Amino acid sequence: MSSSSGSGGSGGGYIQTETDKYVAGVDEVARGTFIGPVIAACVVLPHIFPDDKYKQIKDSKKLSEKKRTELAEYIKTIAITYGVGSASVEEIDAINILNATMKAMHRAVDEAYKKHTFDKLLIDGIYFKGYTPPGLDSELLEYECIPKGDMSYLSIAAASIVAKDYHTNLINDMVAKHPELNLYEIKKNKGYGTPKHLAAINNYGITDFHRKTFGICKYK
C-alpha cells in the first residue's frame, strides 16, 4: 500500500489533501470546442493508494491518449467515488458556455456524491457557482477555486484525466456514427477550432453537432 497522506506531493510534486476529509477534485474539458457537449468530472481519491501507479497521475494535457485511457480506468478503479456530467450543445447555445459548464460540473458532483459523500470541492479555475447536492443538509458544499489546479492537486488532475478520456470516447463514437464529421477532421481535432476545422465550416457549413453561438458558427 502506498500512502500520500498530509500535504506532501506525489512523485510528480502534486498535492494530496487532508486525511481527515474526503475532498473531490473537479475539472472540465471541451469548454472551448466548436462541437459537442462540455464535459466535467468529479473525483475523490483515497488517502492510501494500493500501489505507486498514482504517481503517474498528472494534468491530462501532458498525457498521450493511450496513457489517459489507462490512467482513467485506474482512477475509476481506486477512487472513493467519481462522477461525469455534461451539458449539451442545445444547453450551451441556450444559456451560454459558462452556465453550461456549471451545469456539467454540478451533474458530475451529483453523480459522485450519490455514491459516496464528501466534504469539499477543489475546482480547477477561477469561478464556480456554489452548489448543494441532493441529500446534503447544509446550504452549500464547501468549495475552493484553484487556478491551474490540474497542475498542482492530484484529485483535480485525476478529474481532468477522467473528463478528457470520456470526451475522447464520446467524440470517437460520434464520428463513427456520423462519418460526415470526417470532413471537419473532428476525430483529430476533438472539436477545437483548428485551421482545417474552420476551413471545413466555411466550405460545408455547420452540422447539428456544432455550437451555433460559437465563433464562426454564428455566421453559418
How should these model regions be labeled?
Residues 1-220:
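RNase H-like, Mg2+-dependent phosphodiesterase core
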